[in-house]
Amino acid sequence: IIYVFPDQYRNQAMGFWRQDGFRDKVNFEGDPVHTPNLDAFARESMVLSSAQSNCPLSSPHRGMLLTGMYPNKSGVPLNCNSTRPISSLREDAECIGDVFSKAGYDCAYFGKLHADFPTPNDPEHPGQYVEEKRPAWDAYTPKERRHGFNYWYSYGTFDEHKNPHYWDTDGKRHDPKEWSPLHESGKVISYLKNDGNVRDTKKPFFIMVGMNPPHSPYRSLNDCEEQDFNLYKDQPLDSLLIRPNVDLKMKKAESARYYFASVTGVDRAFGQILTTLKELGLDKNTVVIFASDHGETMCSQRTDDPKNSPYSESMNIPFLVRFPGKIQPRVDDLLLSAPDIMP
C-alpha cells in the first residue's frame, strides 16, 4: 500500500477534470493544469469527487488521518508548534502505522509529518529545538513516537522547498538541496528497490508520503522547478484562475503560476513512483492512493486564507484509489472524510 498526500493540493487542480469521462461528473470546471501522470492514473482508479478534509488545516487533518479520530479526540485540534502544547498526537493512540505493523507490514514514512508538539529534542544538539525560530514549528520525531513506522525519513514542517531536511530512522539529519517532492520520490524508489536492505522483502509494505508542496510559499523559482513553471509563466492570469468566484485583483493572484507549477511537479514525482512500481512488477498487487490534507482557495471566496475554511476550494481534496482487478475504475461521489481512512 502506498498513500501519497501532498499538502494544500485542491481537488480542482487535476487535469483530468477537464477531460471526457470526468468533466460531466462534477459541478466545477477543473483548473487548467498539466498533470499527465494523474490523468493516466485516474483512468485506472476509483476517483472520489466529493472527498473532504473536514478540518482543512495541516496538523488536525494529519491527526485524523493517523488516528481515525476527530481533532477533539486525536490530540491535534490546531497546527502544532512550540506555543501549543495542547496540540500533539496522542502517545496512547493506536495509529494507522501501528495497525499495519501489527498486521505484518513493513511500514515506512517519508516527508512532512507535522503532528507533534515540538520539544527541545534535537538529536545532534540535546536540549535544543531543531530550529532557531520562535515559535518552533519543526520537530524531530523520536522512535517511541513513530507509531509503528519502522523506516523513517521525515521532519515536522519546514517550508523551504528547495532546501529541505529530514531525519532518518536512526536520527541522522540529511540536507539534500533538492526540491522536496522529487527528493522524497527518489527515497521511496530506493525503499521499493530495497537499496541497502532497508525493508523486509518477505513482508508487504505500507508507505506514507507526506509531500509539502504545493503548500506555500509559492512566489518564486525557489519554491518550484523551473521546467514546471515554464508551462505557466506566459499564461494570462485570467486563463489560469478560472473559477467564477475568483478575484483577480487580489495580490495573491500572481502566485497562481507558481502554485500550479508545484502541482505539476508533484504530479511528476508521483509519476516516478508509479513507473518504479511497474518496473519492479509491483503495480498489479499494490494499492496506491493519491490524496491531500486540504485544498487552496487561491483568490476565491474573497479570502486570503488558503485553507481552514468551509469552502470547497479548501475542503474538497483529491482521493484516487488504484487496485488493479479489485477496484473498478470509475468516478464516485462517496462523501469520504479523513477519519474514514483508518482501517
What are these regions (language model features)?
Residues 1-343:
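Formylglycine-dependent sulfatase
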